[in-house]
Amino acid sequence: MKKFLSMIAAVSLLAASLSACGASSTTSTTAAAESGKEYKVAIVQQLDHASLDEIRVAIEAELEAKAAEKGIAIAYKDFNGQNDTTVLNQIGAQVVSDGYDAIIPIATLAATTMATATEDNQIPVIYAAISDPGEAQLTGIANVTGTSDALNTAFILDMMLKANPDIETVGLLYSNSEANSVTPVREAKEYLDSKGIAYLEK
């Protein structure tokens, strides 16, 4: 089981790095394992979105490739939370009830919901596409780990100034309901303050 979980974590890391960035579901099973044991993995995507779709497809491809390489069987099932907390909570309850061996949530709301759903049973949660795991309170949890796709805010703003060095005011557009917005917005404000550039928040 430890080797399986290490493999799942590696798959999540690799898939996230390879990606460019209801509960409709499908199931796929890899080649049968020599031991006859089949591991069940739930892939929980927060919503339909091109970059998240890419990550999910990459995770599925890596699961199949690694399972074939290691000679184990993995049955994975896709769940879509439709960006709805109620739907995600229902998925979390179902995944726990169905006895999945691991959960791979994609994006912040999916990850925090799955972390909460597994508090009692400690099913491993390996998240992907989280910009700020600390701000999302996904760190320091024994059964939760994953990958971060944090922005390099200073680099982005440096490029902006190279393209337009005379810029006087910058608009900061973000969602206050999204935990991933907190750190990059704070970093952007600090950067702009240091350059004496005004900003507007929306």
Pin down the residues of each PLM region.
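Hydrophobic core
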Residues: 9, 13-18
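Periplasmic-binding protein-like
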Residues: 42-44, 95-108, 126, 170-173, ...
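Extracytoplasmic "Venus flytrap"
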Residues: 35-61, 66, 77-86, 177-181
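Bacterial lipoprotein signal-peptidase II cleavage site
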Residues: 18-31
